[in-house]
Amino acid sequence: MIEFGVATAYGTMKRVLMHRPGEELQKVTDDTLEEFHFQRPVKKEKFLADYNGMLELFQSHGVETVLLTDVLKSDDDAMSYIRHRPNMTYTRDLASVFNSGAVLMGPHLKGRWGDQWIVGRALERLGVPILGSIDQPGFLEGGGVTLIGDDIAAAFPLRPGQRSRDPSVERANHG
C-alpha cells in the first residue's frame, strides 16, 4: 500500500504541504477581520519571520517542506485564488491525509470556504488520492481531527461550534 499521511499525531513527520504567506495578507483590514477571523490587521514582517522560523525548524529536523505555490505555479486559477485568501497559510485545517489518501475538510468560516479545493488540487498533483470531502451543511477543520491509527481518526470540536458539526463527522466516513 502506498502511504501518504501519518498513522498517528505523534509520529515522525517526513513531508508537509505548506503555504508561504504573501500579498494575500494585505486582504486583512479592519473591514475584513471578522470574515477572515483575524483579531487585527497582519504585521506582515513579523508574520513572515514567524513563518520562516517554523519552516526552518521543520527543515532542520529533516522534514521535506513542499510549498503550495510551487506545486500550483502553473495553475493560473489557483494562483489567482490564493492571492485573495489570507488564511491559506493554515493548510493543516484544509485536509487530513491518511495512508490511503486525503479527506478535504469543510471550513467553518465563510472566509475560508473553497480553500480546501486548492489544497486538494495540490495534493492530486503530488499523487495523493482524494478520498472524500466534508460538505455543507457540515463542517470540520483539520485542527479538529487527530489520527489515531492507520486510516483511523478521531474528530472533535476544539471549541463548541468552531471546528466541527455532527453531519461533518458522518460524511467523513469514506470506508
Question: Which residue stretches match the model-derived regions?
Answer:
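The feature marks the mature, well-folded catalytic cores of soluble enzymes
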Residues: 1-175
